Amino acid sequence: MKLLDIVNEIIELAETDNFLGRTDVSLSFFYGEGNPIYFVNENNIIKYDDAISRAFNSDKEIEKTYTLKKYHDLLQEHFRECFSKKCSAKNEDVSSFVENLKAESIKTFSVFRDIHGIVLNSPKIPLLLGGYTIYEFASQKEFVESIFDSKTDSFPPIWCNDNPEYLIEWKAEARHFEKAIEIADEHFERFELILRYVIGSATNHFEVGVLNYQGWRQRKAYILSVEEVSNSSTTHGPREPIRLDEPYLVNEDTGYHTVWGFTTKTNLNKFQKRIMLAVEWIGQSMADPSPPSAFIKAAIALEIIFTHSENAIITPSIMNQISESIALILGSSVDERLKIESQVKKLYSLRSKIVHSGNKDISQGDYKTLLEIARSVIKKILTSDKLNSVDSVEDLYTILKKIKYSGDAISQSAGL
């Protein structure tokens, strides 16, 4: 559908008469100079929001550089007369709207947020992890301000007398600062997930957070019965900070350096995107307190790597293919591959029980085994000369098929 048609659908759905004093209004808001848009029919609210989203998603450049809210506000302002008079927009109206949006220059924003649960061995030097930069605030405040002082007449007092211990920075390309925050926050979420994957252990000894930090806390309970009164207090949360500039976290032999490097690239191939998505699902798995849910997320990480289609249902044949592929990648001998294949099939039978019958009886041992298999597959793919240049799942299966059939041929017995 053309943008013109969507805009006129939006105008038609919006009700703009005077709604003051009415009791049947489900939603109302103002646009332009205090002009109201309201909805009586709740279904029209859903249709209106859907139309706004379709309009916003119709141009990828605009979608990448504006927030949905900003786009909505600008659309209402541009077509204010059409809203108030209930008249259809014309092609030239829509063209000028898009041109005005694209006339706004794309700028580079440095977005900083507090990062918790870390410490730096060398705090006087900014730490680079892929596309992220981490600063100890006390040591680096003047350095950060000097970068922007050189580009502006004076540096505004943006810190508002705050005194964070550490800051993490992401540079975002956007047309307004709200979009820069939205983009940066997506990457800060990814940072947390990547770091969990790299740490590799679902433990509460460490917790690094930008947007989702809970920290050290107490859980108290007060217990009463007819015969006694009692209370309980337990501590939860990280016991010590992570030393974020340890070489282990960027080790090339484990592929961690490559994973961080992927965060700086905008042109990842299809398979590299799968790897990064699998890393994020492993990070989600490690943060999930529910054993069945954490188990499923670890399985999803493997399925992202090995399934041809995102819509594929995990049938027995696909499960066999995944198990065999994992065995070929991780095993170094026939016996080891047979053992791994059997192990993965057993773990996938547990996945099936969770999904189809709601089974909650997942042992820590089974979960940790699946988690380590998922992490090991990614490590092997990123560090193996045969696999680190794979650019699609089809390419991966071509290589694995050659490995599978590279064994000795079955020879004919003598005398036959």
Locate the predicted segments by residue.
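Charged, non-catalytic interaction/linker regions at domain boundaries
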Residues: L4-N8, E12, G21, I37, ...
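N-terminal ordered "arm"
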Residues: N18-Y31
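Charge-enriched, short contiguous segments at helix-coil
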Residues: F29-G34, Y38-E42, F295, R337-D391
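Flexible secondary-structure boundary motifs
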Residues: Y48, S58, I300-L338
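Active-site-adjacent bridging/hinge elements
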Residues: N269-A278, S325, K345-R351
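Residue-level detector of well-ordered alpha-helical segments, enriched
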Residues: L277, A294-A298, I318, I322, ...
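Surface-exposed loop-to-helix/strand elements on domain peripheries
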Residues: W281-I282, N320-G331, S349, K353-S357
